[in-house]
């Protein structure tokens, strides 16, 4: 069977480091997040995939208001990205950066694709991921045949969040990738029922290939970046989603509306909905749910 598993994980850098002034409870929660990520890494290694299909919402890196598609496929030869993924290195960098800007009202924005707290450091690595171009093109054509008019691009950048999760879970970077960009930020969002059907179509296509493919959905859970609600977390919504997935009712995610996702701070959940469509109503393993000050973090995997 070519589809060898799926995982869903946050892409927030805050799951891997603590600020100098944080209390012991917060540090303990961050450590739980690290432990969950290491457990997911073991699942990725155990799956022994050839290719990772990364489903990730674009953070205004590849698209903007001139064109912000609900979905887009990368069909180029490689994907570039920058970022630091080692927790101890992140801890060192962020601690020094907080001290550097302590008491100041403004600080320099980061270059595209590099997390802001790493902008003035030379330690960040450039990553170049080899794309499984043949399979990406086959997926594109298969989706068009199934009446999903998915845009494509031959030039794609992996932003810092995408690099964080992808490289942490595959530190050897020894697997080719396929990149499906989504719009989890800019209303109107794609309808979850459409996302679920997209996942089903992807599964049909992957079932016809010989490549061993692992699906990686990044993002979430509840958070409200760049809004007055930043800091509020809809824990009840998050835990309901995880309960549905754990009970093998992932198809119920298709019943949500875009307003449900936006009001609960879960625009990025569309990546999980697509993955649920790929996996079907298979019970997933929920490793943990962690509430940090600004975000709910969910860690799950499917054995297929």
For each predicted feature, which ranges?
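Short HxH-centered metal-ligating active-site micro-motif
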Residues: 40, 47, 54-59, 205, ...
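Catalytic metal-binding/acid-base residues of hydrolase active sites
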Residues: 58-60, 221-222
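Flexible, D/E/H-enriched segments
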Residues: 1-49, 68-197, 208, 228-304
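Short secondary-structure capping/turn micro-motifs that flank functional sites
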Residues: 60-61, 159
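A contiguous pocket-lining binding segment that forms or flanks enzyme active sites
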Residues: 199-204, 212-214, 218-230
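Beta-strand elements within well-structured catalytic alpha/beta cores of enzymes
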Residues: 7, 50-56, 180, 211-219
């Amino acid at each position: 069977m070519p589809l060898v598993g799926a995982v869903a994980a946050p892409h927030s850098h805050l799951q891997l480091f603590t600020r100098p002034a944080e209390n012991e409870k917060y540090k303990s929660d961050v450590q739980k997040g690290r432990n969950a990520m290491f457990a997911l890494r073991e699942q990725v290694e155990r799956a022994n995939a050839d290719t990772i299909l990364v489903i990730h919402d674009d953070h205004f890196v590849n698209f903007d208001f001139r064109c912000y598609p609900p979905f887009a496929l990368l069909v180029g030869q490689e994907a570039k990205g920058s970022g630091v993924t080692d927790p101890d290195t992140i801890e060192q960098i962020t601690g020094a950066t907080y001290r550097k800007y302590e008491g100041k009202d403004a600080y320099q924005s980061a270059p595209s694709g590099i997390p802001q707290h790493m902008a003035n450091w030379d330690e960040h690595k450039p990553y170049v991921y080899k794309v499984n171009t043949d399979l990406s093109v086959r997926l594109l054509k298969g989706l068009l045949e199934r009446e999903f008019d998915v845009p494509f691009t031959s030039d794609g950048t992996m932003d810092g969040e995408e690099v964080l999760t992808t490289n942490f879970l595959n530190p050897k970077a020894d697997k080719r990738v396929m990149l499906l960009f989504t719009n989890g930020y800019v209303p109107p969002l794609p309808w979850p029922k459409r996302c679920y059907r997209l996942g089903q179509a992807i599964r049909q296509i992957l079932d016809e290939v010989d490549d061993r493919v692992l699906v990686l959905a990044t993002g979430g859970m509840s958070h409200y970046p760049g809004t007055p609600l930043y800091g509020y977390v809809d824990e009840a919504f998050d835990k309901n989603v995880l309960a549905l997935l754990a009970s093998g009712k992932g198809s119920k995610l298709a019943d949500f509306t875009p307003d449900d996702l936006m009001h609960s701070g879960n625009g990025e959940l569309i990546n999980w909905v697509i993955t649920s469509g790929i996996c079907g109503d298979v019970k997933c393993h929920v490793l943990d749910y962690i509430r940090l000050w600004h975000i709910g973090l969910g860690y799950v995997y499917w054995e297929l």
